[in-house]
Amino acid sequence: MAKASVELTRELQDSIRRCLSQGAVLQQHRVKLETKPKKFEDRVLALTSWRLHLFPLKVPAKVESSFNVLEIRAFNTLSQNQILVETERGTVSMRLPSAESVDQVTRHVSSALSKVCPGPGCLIRRGNADTPEGPRDTSPNSETSTSTTHSVCGGFSETYAALCDYNGLHCREEVQWDVDTIYHAEDNREFNLLDFSHLESRDLALMVAALAYNQWFTKLYCKDLRLGSEVLEQVLHTLSKSGSLEELVLDNAGLKTDFVQKLAGVFGENGSCVLHALILSHNPIEDKGFLSLSQQLLCFPTGLTKLCLAKTAISPRGLQALGQTFGANPAFASSLRYLDLSKNPGLLATDEANALYSFLAQPNALVHLDLSGTDCAVDMLLGALLHGCCSHLTYLNLARNSCSHRKGREAPPAFKQFFSSVYTLSHVNLSATRLPLEALRALLQGLSLNSHLSDLHLDLSSCELRSAGAQALQEQLGAVTCIGSLDLSDNGFDSDLLTLVPALGKNKSLKHLFLGKNFNVKAKTLEEILHKLVQLIQEEDCSLQSLSVADSRLKLRTSILINALGSNTCLAKVDLSGNGMEDIGAKMLSKALQINSSLRTILWDRNNTSALGFLDIARALESNHTLRFMSFPVSDISQAYRSAPERTEDVWQKIQWCLVRNNHSQTCPQEQAFRLQQGLVTSSAEQMLQRLCGRVQEEVRALRLCPLEPVQDELLYARDLIKDAKNSRALFPSLYELGHVLANDGPVRQRLESVASEVSKAVDKELQVILESMVSLTQELCPVAMRVAEGHNKMLSNVAERVTVPRNFIRGALLEQAGQDIQNKLDEVKLSVVTYLTNSIVDEILQELYHSHKSLARHLTQLRTLSDPPGGASQGQDPSSRGRGRNHDHEETDDELGTNIDTMAIKKQKRCRKIRPVSAFISGSPQDMESQLGSLGIPPGWFSGLGASQTTASGSWEGLSELPTHGYKLRHQTQGRPRPPRTTPPGPGRPSVPVPGPRQENGMATRLDEGLEDFFSRRVMDESSSYPRTLRTMRPGLSEPPLPPLQKKRRRGLFHFRRPRSFKGDRGPGSPTAGLLLPPPPPPPPTQESPPSPDPPSLGNNSSPCWSPEEESSLLPGFGGARGSSFCRKMGTERLEAGEGAPAPGTAQQPRVHGGVALPGLGRTKGWSFDGKREGTDPDQEDSTQAWQKRRSSDDAGPGAWKPPPPPQSSKPSFSAMRRAEATWHIAEESAANHSCQSPSPASQDGDEEKQGALFPERMVPTRNAKLQEPPIGPRPPKPVAVPRGRRAPQVPGGREETESSSAAPGANKPRLRLGSQQDQEEPEGQGPTDQGRRTAPLKPKRTRRAQSCDKLEPDRRQPPDPTGVCGTSEPGTD
């Protein structure tokens, strides 16, 4: 503060300071103010930063008048001590005590004006009134200026404070602090009104007004903030005054319709305007404004570099004026680089757009062009761009437009020519544009011919390409090498992705792929598509770096893709948003993150994830050190926070902490990567190696005594291969350990240590030079202070301590930070090298072992063929069966190994090993299918056996080189497939020869034909949901309990008159009647007619049966084991012709154990053993049953097959007889038991088979070549007599139990499902009187279909089962 005049008392000065407490008083002078002409009064002049105050000489002090420095229009010095100040409100004349006081006041006013207005300010004249001097320039750039160096950011804070004082408003110190601190620290020359949007409109207006006099800021930015009229007026004022504002952004600022007209006028007023970027998007602007603006743009000498008029409601008329301006002003052709006219519907739909097309067709400098949503014709626009925009255009957005040419016609040549000629294009957006198929083909063809582009982003989302577009992409995309990012979202591809995804994988330049909203398919097809996608990203040469399936609603099936991320090494970014995968998907993602080391970014939201799912992710990130970014799942986090706020907050903080940790350089756990890769490399091939080595060792032992020299050479080579195979197990860990040991003191670490030492020396030398230079400069500027400091020896010693950098810091920065990053990358490369070497060696060993195995197996087969004596075991076999016997060993080698051992199969197994298996929660998984089939009474092994039979075949071509040339009968591989029923039997010249189906690795026949016969006859309605099926539901009897009232009421439904059908075979362990089944009675001792057959000769070295003990223990009743009766039908003929017999009939068969529970009733069923072999039969019966077998060979096929003749009409009972159902069934069961011991005629045999087919539809008679044994002829039963309801029929001599026991003769050997006690089964047989001269058919109650459907289930539920067996049994074959 300047020294106050001596005439002023201390009390007055303090009173003035107290009065001006808001501002510091810089000067106080006692002056004489001219109140009237030539009349002066004493006053006190007080000067503050921006204002001059006049006080009377009174205490307490009060302000008499004041004015701001900005109100000064002229400041004149009339004499040595008199000044004249002209203000907006009048003139002030005053005399100061001395000339020194005049100079002080003059310098203060000049300095204040220079701070507010850096340019030439007001004029200050000095001299007498008669002889005035010339003007004195007090601007800061002039020599006479007394202003000091400007403050930060061009003095914005001072200008803002002066304007606040001028307008009488309070100065916001926060504005000054933000500008002086934040803007200055960032060197930011963009004044953003959003930073101060919390203030009032008048405060914003003052800030904008301050920019008019500021030369630091060059850009005024405001977006999505509605500006008031006061602010907009100051914007126009700033543009009219500023000479440094280059860019104006008023995006969605609420501009009035006349603002552009005023803006055009401002451009005309300010000749020094340097504005070159104008952004007025998202403001309603009328055509008047555009017309005025176009006229002013004609006068811009340098043109505009950026013009954005998106969504401004501009009409084609305004666009025409703008286009004419572009063409008339040549400066725009070289200056305009950014043009945005998007979101103006109909703008380019008329002929007024030709003016803009003409400008685009001329050579120009456009780099960014956005015409999305303007209804322009894409083909016409590309024709204009072809001539003028090929050299500089990098961004082209033509979304939400259309093409002018019609569908079916050829695309204009501009499509292909433009995309083949453009040089710098990097982004093309054609989303929501209906591209005809021809235009899409032309686009892809043009890109395929362009050799200048690379990493192009092509957006074809929402183009409704569908199947035709998918086909075009498959055909053309493989030849396009410039596309680095492809967006195909929401195109309705759906099932076409099955073929499109593999085609996308063939393009190795593709790095980023977007496939969201294309999965609107059924569950089965969706799983196939996801498996194709998994196969794509698991390829070793996959080029994808990011994959997006956002908003696809994959739900739980997202886990199919997630399971492949664990071992994936190519993807660095994945987007799983909008799929609703819930917590179980988050759990699968956590498992993938635990072992993944390539993902850097994960985007996921809208997946219905709760706090529990986020907890799984947090736990996974504890062991993941490579994931850097995870998008904030706003939707899921907010939903989880509502239910569990504390847990959600803790879990998300934990996730963020892990991500922050991963963004710093650190040591990656290489041991985890080693163990993971070791498991993927070794476990997939180790099992195959073990099995191959075991097989080759057996063959070597079998051929070790062979004297042939070639065989011995091969044996020696095989032994060497086995040694290599054993050593290969230690190859992967040995190579990894070797690389780890050599890397500890390798050249990289040594070089880093030497570099650290050299850097430390260089740092010390540089600091020494800097210190000396600073000290010398300080001596020049402040020599006295330096001499004093050196005398005290303080400064240099303190500086010397500060200018040293610790050596351990430099060493840690190089070795622990940069060196650690280098070491991590080096470890990854070493691991990939070890993996490649191990894979290559193991593949070679597998190939050589397999070839050696095939060669030794061929030698072994030839030796066995030569050693078989003529007329031996193979005597009596047909040529086809002998050929199969000779080729048996060679055929089973691959299948027993599980797959063909070739490169394709090995790679497939490794890829499958890298993918996590499907979880049980996904519907359609094998586990769920097993449980569903088990609930329906189908054995659990059925589905797994079917799946195994379908997947064991490999895509191998090895077998093509080993086709037999002689001695074997060639058969087509599809000959064994099930076929639909034939309406006519085959002719005599074309006998039906059974063909054995393909085998699985355990020797069993495949189950591909399971369910085929039931498929052609099954009804649409499912009857399993209304009532449970038991064995009693097949035929009602007298012993059933009465139905409860609720069940009786349910039976009155609409569909309960229909007759239920049984499943194939008996129920599984979960059936209600599984515990009621009892084992059959022991068969009688063997007789001469059925001698026991010897064990079949093995075809290999101690070959085991067709199934293992575990599989044998899982056999189910009615299925002949887990393979079912189809296996028995396929294998029966081959076993019989090979001379294989069944186990001795005199041996009682023990109950099988399934799942730890003994299942009774698993004895030999209907003449079939568990080995799939028919009991011995008499050849005399073959001729009489040959025709019957031909008719019955396709009974399972369906409705078109042969049926037994219906009973005569006279045998059908009347309605009164229908009411005696229980007695009739009881007699029918006794008659059927007695009749089973009789000699069957063709008609009766057909009847038995028809009865058996209902309960056991798969248990059919073997193939035509099987021979039947004639059973012993016994007495026929008497004709049944109808018994009234409620009475018991008269007992036949011999009893029912004896009759049923006699049916277990070797000839019949029919399965039983008895409910009686064990004592009933041990009773001796009895004979009853029979009629020898009468042939009777199996007795059935002849009832109408409606009566059968109404009564068949009711007796079954009336009475509980009798454990004593008194109430009789139900024969399964009576249906």
Swiss-Prot record:
Cellular component per GO, a single term: cytoplasm
Pfam hit, one: CARMIL_C
Biased composition (Basic and acidic residues): 1007-1022, 1219-1229, 1348-1360
Subcellular location per the Swiss-Prot or TrEMBL entry: Cytoplasm; Cell membrane
InterPro entries documented for this protein: CARMIL_C, CARMIL_PH, Leu-rich_rpt, LRR_dom_sf, PH-like_dom_sf, PP1-Reg/Actin-Interact_Protein
GO biological process: regulation of postsynapse assembly
Biased composition (Basic residues): 1047-1062
Chief location of this protein within or outside the cell: cytoplasm
Protein name: Capping protein, Arp2/3 and myosin-I linker protein 3
Highest classification ranks of the organism: Eukaryota, Metazoa, Chordata, Craniata, Vertebrata
Gene: Carmil3
